[in-house]
Amino acid sequence: MAEYLVPKSAVVFEEEIKKSRFITYLQHTEGLEDARAFWAKIKQEHPNARHHCWAAVAGKPTDSLQLGFSDDGEPAGTAGKPMLSALQGSQLGEISAVVVRYYGGILLGTGGLVRAYGNGVQQALKLIESEIKVERTLFKLDCDYGQLRLVQQLCEKYQVEILSQGFQANIHLILGISEKTIEAFSSELTEKSSGRLVIQLLEIGE
C-alpha cells in the first residue's frame, strides 16, 4: 500500500447515555508511541473521569503490528475492541481514539457499553476530514551549488520531498520519494546531470 488516508484534523464528539457522559477524541497519531502519548494527554485533561478507553490504528490500515487498544477498567471487550473495530472500518491509518466516560450512576450492561463506545467513535469519524498520505522511501543526494536548481526543479516535477538540506562544501540532501516515481526521477536526474547526480538509498542509522 503506497498511499492511504490519514486524519487531517482532530475532532471531538460528545453524548450522554443514561446519565453517563461520553466524550470521544480522534486525532492523527503516527506510531504507537505517539498514540499512547495522545491517550496520556487526554487522561491528564480529564483526571476525574471514571474511564479513559483507547484504540489506535497507528500505522498503515493494513499493518497489524501498529494496532492497540485498552478497556481501562471497563469489562473486557466492551470498550477498546469496539472502538478499534470502528477505526478499522473507516480504512484510515495513523488514527487514535480516546473515549472519556464520566459515570452517571446507571449501569449500561456489556451490550450497552459496546454500543456506547463503538458508536461514539463511529459518530466522531463522520466529522473527520482526511487526506492522502504517500509512503516515501528515503534517499540521500550530494550536489554542488550549481546543480541545486536542477535538483529543485525535478523534485517539484516528481513531487519529491526535500526533507533536509546540509550546506557545506557541497549540499547534502535527504529526499523522500514515492515508490511510483523513484525510477523516473532517478533516470532524469542522472541524464540531465550527465551522470554526475545519483541518488543513494538512506541506510538506517545514517
UniProtKB/Swiss-Prot annotation:
Signal peptide: none annotated. InterPro entries: EFG_III/V (IPR035647), Impact (IPR023582), Impact_N (IPR001498), Impact_N_sf (IPR036956), Impact_YigZ-like (IPR015796), Ribosomal_Su5_D2-typ_SF (IPR020568), UPF0029_Impact_C (IPR015269), UPF0029_Impact_CS (IPR020569). PROSITE patterns: UPF0029 (PS00910). One of its GO terms (cellular component) is cytoplasm. One of its GO terms (molecular function) is ribonucleoside triphosphate phosphatase activity. Gene3D superfamilies: 3.30.70.240, Impact, N-terminal domain. GO terms for biological process: regulation of translational initiation. Pfam families: DUF1949, UPF0029. It comes from the Bacteria. Belongs to the IMPACT family. PANTHER family: IMPACT FAMILY MEMBER YIGZ, IMPACT-RELATED. This is IMPACT family member HI_0722.
